[in-house]
């Protein structure tokens, strides 16, 4: 940890948590390794890379058969999967206070539970399945809820260091 790297040891008493008044000494918070505080950002970046590979493979497949019916799916996978999640990961990595929130976790799970079926339903809609339209609308609204979690989280919890 940063605190330990500075050559200082935490006094044993400062690591105790008093349950009665639920206070944490600031030294105990500083003693938490950086990787644990910023783990949410890394989760976003890792899953973003998965979407990058999927989107790239879809694009290569469409190019190889010269059929671009699924171009909107390709674009959505890369923009909502790769770009937006990678950017969120970088923001959460730079602002660990925003990373350690329920909103960050809600954003991660909503986004990643909705995006894959959203892409399947979009593909069905593009190939003429009209019944996919209402499901596509619902998935879009849920995706917006996930992105709203991100917006509220960043606006309220992303603070400059120091």
Show the residue positions of the predicted features:
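Hydrophobic alpha-helical transmembrane segments of multi-pass integral membrane proteins
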Residues: 2-6, 11, 17-19, 23-162
């Amino acid at each position: 940890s940063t605190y330990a790297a500075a050559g200082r040891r935490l006094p044993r008493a400062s690591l105790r948590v008093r349950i009665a008044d639920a206070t944490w000494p600031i030294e105990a918070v500083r003693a938490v390794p950086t990787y644990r505080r910023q783990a949410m950002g890394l989760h976003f970046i890792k899953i973003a890379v998965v979407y990058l590979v999927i989107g790239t493979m879809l694009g290569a497949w469409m190019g190889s058969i010269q059929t671009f019916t699924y171009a909107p799916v390709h674009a959505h996978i890369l923009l909502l999967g790769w770009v937006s999640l990678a950017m969120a990961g970088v923001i959460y990595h730079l602002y660990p206070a925003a990373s350690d929130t329920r909103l960050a976790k809600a954003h991660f799970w909503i986004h990643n539970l909705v995006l894959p079926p959203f892409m399947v339903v979009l593909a069905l809609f593009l190939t003429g399945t009209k019944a996919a339209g209402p499901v596509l609308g619902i998935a879009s609204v849920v995706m917006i809820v996930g992105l709203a979690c991100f917006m509220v989280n960043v606006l309220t919890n992303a603070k400059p260091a120091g």
